[in-house]
Amino acid sequence: CFLLESFGIKIEGIGTTTLVIHGKKSIDLDVEHYNSEDPIESMFFISAGIVTKSKLSVLRCPIEFITLELEKLKRMGLIYSVTKEYLAKNKRTRLVDITISPSKLSAPLEKIHTQPFPGINNDNLPFFVPIACFATGQTLIHDWTWENRAIYFTELNRLGADIKLLDPHRALVTSVQKLRGAQIVSPPALRPTAIILIAMLAAEGTSMLRNVYSIKRGYADIAERLNSIGAKITVIR
């Protein structure tokens, strides 16, 4: 939306669930544009920090798009702090730095599910699966928007998780004491592959994730970035 506005397009309803776009017959101008930071990438690193029981600071998080995720995690027992807001380079996106601390989590009483903005982001929902593996009790994850994506959540069982598929949209996650290393072939879907990688970071021993194209297309230099904060990942080419 911000890019279109820089082209002179009028957009009503930014920040709501409904947009009204008033088009133009032609656009002929040069603009300099900075993309907004990615809330899904923020949630990836938050999830990785939680399951590895790490103290981790995740910088430049677009707070508007992960507020409900943080509130859910707070209710589950996550200890974290948030800096004052500051603007991204595009002068529109509100950013914060989030520092998470090792926490004892409990399963929420209510199910975790997505909703249109400002609800939990559809692509952030899978990150609650590895988190729920270490949250005492049982967590119901309801992935109602994607057909059969929840099936891939059970791949974490290969690492020692206890996840039961109730139907193509709902998975029941029972907490476990630990995960163990395993070899897993990446699913064709990006987010399920990402949560397998996150779970492997928390698993004891060595794991191997094969056929990683799906995650490479969604996360730039992910192995190198994780290694920079303490992971031990070797990319085999």
Regions found by a protein language model. Name each.
Residues C1-R237:
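Short, structured segments at the rim of ligand-binding sites
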